[in-house]
Curated annotation (Swiss-Prot):
Protein name, UniProt field: UPF0659 protein C216.03
Species of the source: Schizosaccharomyces pombe (strain 972 / ATCC 24843)
Pfam families associated with the record: NAD_binding_10
Signal sequence region: none
Recorded family membership: Belongs to the UPF0659 family.
Record flagged with keyword Nucleus: yes
């Protein structure tokens, strides 16, 4: 049995993760900003914890983590485009930094960061395996939701800088759908012009969270043809991140 704390615990992926994890016998604490979200969490057998990443201090979060002492922290929080650039910065970047600080204070090491495919430094050339279609799509995506990507990149970059304190894995799913998961994925250096079911995302997050051989790997992922556990095993053996953050 593994104990998880999920920041952003009311999101679609978080709720699917909670359902899958609790059905497998694990314990999940879903951290949300408002107790009104409790009903949805209870339906999937999660345990609601109220903590606003915008208002809490690292010490507040550390106290909460110390009381639960989870085996794994999952960061799935995000402003979701609500509240403008200031709120995106406050949740996606500053909220993440608070969690990193809190984990260090509380002595918790394992973190799964749910990021996004193509989260990269746009001042640098695109990855060499990108096709012309990938490059065109990348430019459109970053023009559309550049603020999100900017702060998500800074959060991921800072996490990599803290590798001595945090045993992180950064998971970067492609665009997501609400279709039923096939249980099969593609991991690694993949096209960004693809989609992934949220159920497959949640199942992949769980299996990576339970795999301590994936520490300090960056993983791009989408729906594919390989069973999730086999895809993870192959990725871990290869040990090559999908992207390298400059630090």
């Amino acid at each position: 049995m593994t104990v998880f704390v999920v920041f952003g615990g009311h999101g679609k992926v978080a709720l699917l993760f909670t359902k899958i994890a609790t059905e497998a016998g694990h314990i999940v604490y879903n951290v949300v900003r408002d107790y009104v979200q409790n009903e949805d969490i209870e339906k999937v057998h999660g345990r609601t914890s109220v903590c606003s990443l915008e208002k809490a201090t690292p010490n507040d979060i550390a106290q909460f983590l110390a009381e639960i002492h989870p085996d794994v922290v999952i960061f799935a929080a995000g402003a979701g485009g609500k509240g403008g650039p200031e709120r995106t910065r406050a949740v996606d970047y500053e909220g993440a930094i608070k969690v990193y600080d809190a984990m260090r204070i509380a002595g918790i090491r394992r973190l799964i960061m749910i990021s996004a495919i193509d989260n990269r430094d746009m001042s640098q050339p695109p990855p060499p395996y990108y096709t012309a279609a990938d490059i065109e799509l990348s430019e459109k995506i970053h023009q559309s939701i550049g603020t999100y990507y900017h702060y998500k990149y800074l959060a991921d970059q800072e996490l990599v800088r803290r590798s001595s304190d945090i045993d992180w894995t950064i998971l970067r799913p492609s665009g997501m759908t609400d279709e039923k998961g096939s249980g099969k994925v593609a991991l690694g250096k993949i096209s960004i012009n693809c989609m992934m079911s949220r159920e497959n995302v949640a199942r992949t997050v769980l299996l990576f969270a339970l795999d301590n051989q994936s520490i300090h790997l960056v993983v791009d992922m989408t729906d594919g043809n390989v069973p999730i556990y086999k895809a993870i095993a192959g990725f871990v053996v290869k040990g090559e991140s999908s992207y390298t953050y400059s630090v």
